[in-house]
């Protein structure tokens, strides 16, 4: 015991003096002597367990075929996207289960533009993988065999600090934060993932008061305190809400393990916590960003907001009121990243904000992927801004409903199992594609078939995107139904959206639409 403690304290002292020193240990999470190293040096102390073994193996494999590798350690997905463009490297790799259970741990790849690889580029990679018939014949090397001139460089904490500094430059309400940030009480949980260091750094740098859910701070590949580490789910936010009630906090943030999705819970007028949907957060942040840019005289004439087409249509009138273009893309933030790249090359538009209903948001062009760290900062300062203006986030949300109509968005997932799952899901979509859809109480304005790339209404029009197995039904009077197989898990996803005159009217409509359409699937 004493030897372990002496060993740990000596190494800690050396690491404080020399940022080049890194530690690889098999049990940092459990042993007494080195447990503190991971807390003090999260970017330089590696527990060579599940995640780090994968990370080191990938680094060694890339080096064995002549690649220089920048090893980041435990960092958020958007930080990888940021560094790809910052360093001008050929690509980036993130090993993550994202917001899914640990069984979904996988390999996320970024192109040299810092965006997730396009479907075309992904197809090329898959083609190479399928050519491998003997995995043991693939050229590889041990981590300790890497040649110095073609080796692995471990980036230090300076990288995280640069990332945080970049994000704080995107702040829109520094005056309100300076006055009220220290009084705002936020509870934050990284859900056993990568968000703790950057989220805490960016919020504290702005002077915002944050408390953390200690049980969920340490990176844990088993996600031990939750069934599914998805901040979209109310269950994943339970410990955070419990702590918030205990200490009287105003807001609860949760980031998924790779910190690209943000879940939020706020208090209503009765003081009870409500979990906001990704669509509600998307509308609030869109309105806030455009509002502040306009107030500061910085709203460009060619500004653009981008959303996936399954995300709420409530942002359309918001963008219209601010004179900003709203553009729709398929599901997957890579398509938003692709648009950002096109804007920069063509100078046609200035990117202002992007979001997906699945709790993914982005302000800024530092990354071409969703970023829960910058979203946390924006939501925190938005809360301060509205408090400074004698209102609240909850009141502003309801004022938007009063102004634009009450929109309810709902997503239903139907799970499939086994090797035939994809075929079964595609068969359901094909069946609906060949059918005339009629739902009692609703009229179909047009049908978008993203496989053929055609929109069929009174006239047939060409869509911007094609080759995607997705059907989208536009409803008369506002709203939609969208049907698509998930791209990350064996689930058929159905998205519903309705516009009502009030909450009661919209609730009745969404129930009627859901029941009516699901009858057609049987």
Where are these predicted regions, by residue range?
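Gly/Ser/Thr-enriched, mixed-charge loops and adjacent short helices
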Residues: 105-239, 243-244
């Amino acid at each position: 015991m004493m030897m372990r403690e002496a060993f740990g304290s000596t190494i800690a002292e050396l690491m404080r003096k020399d940022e080049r020193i890194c530690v690889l240990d098999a049990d940092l999470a459990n042993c007494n002597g080195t447990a503190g190293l991971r807390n003090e040096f999260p970017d330089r102390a590696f527990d060579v367990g599940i995640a780090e073994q994968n990370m080191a193996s990938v680094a060694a494999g890339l080096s064995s075929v002549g690649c220089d590798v920048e090893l980041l350690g435990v960092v958020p997905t958007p930080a990888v996207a940021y560094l790809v463009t910052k360093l001008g490297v050929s690509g980036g790799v993130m090993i993550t289960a994202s917001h899914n259970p640990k069984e979904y741990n996988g390999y996320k790849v970024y192109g040299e533009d810092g965006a997730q690889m396009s479907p075309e580029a992904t197809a090329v990679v898959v083609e190479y993988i399928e050519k491998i018939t003997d995995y043991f014949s693939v050229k590889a090397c041990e981590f300790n065999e890497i040649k110095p001139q073609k080796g692995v460089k471990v980036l230090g904490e300076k990288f995280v600090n640069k990332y945080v500094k970049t994000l704080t430059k995107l702040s829109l309400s520094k005056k309100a934060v300076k006055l009220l940030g220290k009084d705002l009480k936020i509870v934050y949980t990284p859900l056993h993932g990568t968000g703790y260091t950057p989220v805490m750094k960016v919020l504290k740098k702005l002077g915002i008061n944050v408390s953390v859910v200690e049980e969920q701070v340490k990176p844990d590949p088993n996600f031990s305190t939750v069934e599914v580490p998805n901040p979209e789910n109310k269950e994943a936010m339970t410990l955070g809400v419990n702590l918030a009630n205990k200490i009287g906090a105003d807001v609860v943030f949760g980031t998924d393990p790779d910190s690209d999705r943000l879940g939020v819970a706020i208090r209503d007028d009765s003081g009870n916590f409500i979990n906001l949907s990704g669509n509600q957060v998307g509308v609030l942040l869109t309105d806030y960003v455009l509002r502040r840019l306009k107030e500061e005289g910085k709203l460009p004439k060619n500004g653009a907001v981008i959303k996936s087409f399954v995300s709420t249509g409530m942002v359309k009138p918001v963008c219209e009121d601010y004179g900003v273009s709203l553009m729709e893309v398929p599901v997957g933030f890579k398509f938003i990243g692709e648009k950002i790249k096109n804007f920069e090359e063509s100078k046609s538009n200035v990117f202002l904000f992007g979001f997906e209903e699945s709790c993914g948001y982005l302000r800024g062009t530092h990354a071409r992927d969703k970023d829960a760290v910058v979203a946390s900062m924006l939501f925190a300062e938005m809360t301060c801004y509205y408090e400074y203006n004698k209102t609240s986030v909850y009141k502003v949300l309801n004022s938007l409903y009063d102004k634009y109509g009450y929109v309810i968005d709902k997503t239903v997932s139907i799970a499939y199992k086994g090797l035939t799952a994809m075929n079964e899901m595609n068969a359901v979509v094909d069946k609906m594609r060949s059918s005339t859809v009629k739902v009692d109480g609703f009229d179909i304005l047009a049908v978008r078939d993203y496989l053929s790339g055609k929109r069929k209404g009174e006239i047939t029009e060409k869509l911007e995107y094609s080759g995607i197995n997705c059907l989208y039904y536009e409803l008369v009077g506002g709203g939609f139904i969208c049907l698509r197989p998930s791209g990350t898990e064996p689930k058929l996803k159905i998205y519903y959206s309705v516009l009502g005159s009030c909450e009661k009217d919209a609730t009745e409509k969404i129930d009627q639409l859901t029941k009516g359409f699901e009858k057609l699937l049987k």
